[in-house]
């Protein structure tokens, strides 16, 4: 479903202290945009309405987070959900940066100096048609870009409801010299301890769809 345009979204975002309107300006220097410059940096690609980031960020003040999506209409909802989570936990909101960015061009805002330690990819578009598969966030074309700014031993955490995307992504990771260190094809019955349920995850689970999850380590 296409989201209705919200003309008030960008002004609200630009008034937000943790929104970064022009992320390219910080390429290679992201650590210095955070209050605690010594924290490791984790990246969420396609943060959606921010459910995942709101929980992760507020639970882990010792980690800095970059959350990316493309539409202001989505980002403004993420902004509100993140603010709400921090307020409810009485936490200082100083370890999250929210920004608009086309993920296919992620290499225009991050480089090897940024030393990202973990990437989260949750329920991305599966792009099932062969001619579109290069658009997948787990495709080798993208993984090659991630390798540039992901530290050696850094991880990609990937969740999806889509069987074909999951199985083909296993091959993508192998081709790009990642080691699969954890894998389950039924996350909710796997015993995996710290799983933050996203809005898409909840919807798919209610439909009886098993959630696939893996952790891939950069070699």
From Swiss-Prot:
S-adenosyl-L-methionine binds at residues 44, 69, 102, 125. One of its GO terms (molecular function) is tRNA (guanine(46)-N7)-methyltransferase activity. Keywords: Methyltransferase, S-adenosyl-L-methionine, Transferase, tRNA processing. GO terms for cellular component: tRNA methyltransferase complex. Coiled coil: none annotated. Pfam families: Methyltransf_4. Pathway: tRNA modification; N(7)-methylguanine-tRNA biosynthesis. InterPro entries: SAM-dependent_MTases_sf, tRNA_(Gua-N-7)_MeTrfase_Trmb, tRNA_methyltr_TrmB_bact. It catalyses: guanosine(46) in tRNA + S-adenosyl-L-methionine = N(7)-methylguanosine(46) in tRNA + S-adenosyl-L-homocysteine. This is tRNA (guanine-N(7)-)-methyltransferase.
């Amino acid at each position: 479903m296409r989201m209705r345009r919200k003309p008030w979204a960008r002004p609200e975002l630009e008034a937000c202290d943790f929104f970064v309107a022009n992320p390219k300006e910080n390429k290679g220097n992201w650590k210095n945009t955070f209050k605690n410059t010594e924290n490791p940096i984790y990246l969420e690609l396609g943060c959606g309405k921010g459910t995942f980031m709101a929980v992760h960020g507020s639970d882990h003040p010792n980690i800095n987070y970059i959350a990316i999506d493309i539409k202001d209409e989505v980002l403004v909802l993420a902004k509100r959900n993140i603010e709400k989570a921090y307020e409810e936990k009485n936490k200082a909101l100083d370890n999250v940066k929210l920004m608009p960015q086309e993920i296919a061009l992620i290499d225009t805002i991050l480089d090897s100096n940024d030393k990202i330690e973990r990437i989260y990819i949750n329920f991305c578009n599966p792009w099932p048609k062969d001619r579109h598969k290069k658009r997948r966030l787990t495709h080798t074309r993208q993984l090659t870009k991630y390798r540039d700014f992901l530290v050696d031993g850094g991880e990609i955490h990937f969740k999806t409801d889509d069987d074909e995307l999951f199985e083909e992504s296993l091959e993508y990771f192998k081709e790009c010299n990642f080691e699969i260190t954890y894998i389950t094809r039924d996350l909710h019955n796997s015993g995996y301890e710290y799983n933050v349920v996203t809005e898409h995850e909840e919807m798919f689970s209610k439909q009886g769809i098993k959630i696939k999850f893996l952790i891939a380590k950069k070699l």
